[in-house]
Amino acid sequence: MPRPPRSWVCACLEGPFISRAEKGAQYEPGIRLPDPSEMEELAEAGRGWVRIVDYAPEEDVEARFLATVVRLGILACLGHTAATYEQAMRAIDGGARHATHLFNAMSPLEHRAPGVAGAMLTDRRATVEIIADGIHIHPAIARLVIAARGFRDVALITDAVAPAGLPEGDYEFVGRKITVCCGAIRLASGSLAGSMLTLDGAVRNIVTFTGIGWSEAISMATHVPATIAGVALRKGRIAPGADADLVALDDHGFVQRTWVHGHLAYQGAPGKDS
């Protein structure tokens, strides 16, 4: 089978301009304050590929970093942040338009302190994404997100890391010990370190968790993220002029075949779920 052409969409920087308090599994020595000059250097080095960047707005006190990101035409995302609701709303007012893995590595939703999650659930100027594995968020939270925002503003992501798909056991990842167990990947501290989720699994889960239809769930994994990344004219849809990146699912939502730019890239065993 000929090797299919690569189909990169963009580069997303999930660091280093994040909060140490909400670093999750990120490498703490690499975390830095949001720096407009460094962001400009990264954008230049990326030669147009850097289109999404996470940052902690509470660390960008004068909002100079956000202004730089917006001026560069890069999508500013609230992620790995301990921002208050008010700080999150000021960031949205300033041009931030997305939240990375909603509810994870961010200030929580509380009835007197809505946090970043509260801001993103109630302000339709911004889009959100969720890790629908039933571990990063409870199925009831998935239902809450869909009820508040609807499927058109919510992207499904995996947050999968290199050990995803490996048997249960201990591994080394980016110089740290991690454990794969019970469908999760954790650091020695017990903190989640990415997921074992596949995107077809996310689609199946969101249908089960929320009761939405297959077409809506598939849109959350295709058209919605393509729109967020600014590539919806050629990705995330089947239409003349769009890239022929296709996935064939069986009746249960498991991947059977994939095509990249029209080239068959994967074929599962006949009659078996992948």
Language-model features: locations:
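Divalent-metal coordination cores built from histidine and acidic residues
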Residues: 1-49
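Structured loop/turn residues at beta-strand edges in well-structured enzyme cores
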Residues: 6, 48, 94, 152, ...
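Active-site core of metal-dependent hydrolases
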Residues: 40-168, 265
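Short, function-defining helix-loop hinge/capping sites that tune catalysis or transport
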Residues: 109, 167, 173, 253, ...
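His/Asp/Glu-enriched, well-ordered alpha-helical/loop segment
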Residues: 118-129, 134, 146-158, 163-249
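C-terminal cap of metal-dependent C-N hydrolases
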Residues: 227, 237-274
